[in-house]
């Protein structure tokens, strides 16, 4: 399976608490819900497409508990996101959860210190996509281990100014290419992007130079 990461992100890279004031107040974050005023009809349509591709979903503990609380209440059979989360295979990284499966459908808890190797083995299973949603700390761990194949983002035209960022200081340098992009419906200016890891995965380096009076690269 490919490992894909799905994120709502601000112009300054913040991914913390986009959907509500109390969604993730950890670290004293008091700017939760920053996405909501910028959401218009049709703008989040790509999210349904994301979940429609999922063979399994991988979450960190905090995101798992937040999603379980909210999405387990959604019983609309036409809601693609709710169907994927409530009935599909889920994996949650946690050393403390004990009732995940009983409380929310088909859920397997990944325990221990070898999370990267456990996820690596999941990727080796047949299937389409192993999807990560939210899960800031887990995403950073998987990125630094070189396990993320695809990022799908919806970037909103707002600067939050504080909070957990998708790529904070010290992230392993990596290169991606944009394979899909479009301005989301609704007119607020949000941009949906799909970025696929390049074959080398490295950023490389170069410089601009002038040769015979012409600008070039080296």
Where are these regions (language model features)?
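Enzymes that bind and transform nitrogen-containing heteroaromatic metabolites
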Residues: 1-218
């Amino acid at each position: 399976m490919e490992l894909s990461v799905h994120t709502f992100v601000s112009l300054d890279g913040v991914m913390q608490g986009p959907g509500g004031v109390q969604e993730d107040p950890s670290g004293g974050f008091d700017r939760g819900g920053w996405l909501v005023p910028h959401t218009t009809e049709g703008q989040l349509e790509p999210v349904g497409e994301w979940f429609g591709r999922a063979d399994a979903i991988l979450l960190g503990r905090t995101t798992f508990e937040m999603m379980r609380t909210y999405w387990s209440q959604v019983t609309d059979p036409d809601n693609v996101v709710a169907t994927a989360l409530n009935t599909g295979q889920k994996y949650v990284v946690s050393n403390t959860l004990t009732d995940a499966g009983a409380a929310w459908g088909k859920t397997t808890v990944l325990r221990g210190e070898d999370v990267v190797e456990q996820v690596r083995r999941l990727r080796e299973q047949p299937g389409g996509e192993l999807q990560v949603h939210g899960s800031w700390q887990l995403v950073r761990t998987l990125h630094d281990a070189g396990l993320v194949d695809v990022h799908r983002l919806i970037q909103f035209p707002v600067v939050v100014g504080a909070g957990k960022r998708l790529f904070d200081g010290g992230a392993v340098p990596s290169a991606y290419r944009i394979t899909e992009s479009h301005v989301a419906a609704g007119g607020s200016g949000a941009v949906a992007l799909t970025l696929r890891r390049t074959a080398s995965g490295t950023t490389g380096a170069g410089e601009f130079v002038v040769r015979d009076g012409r600008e070039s690269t080296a």
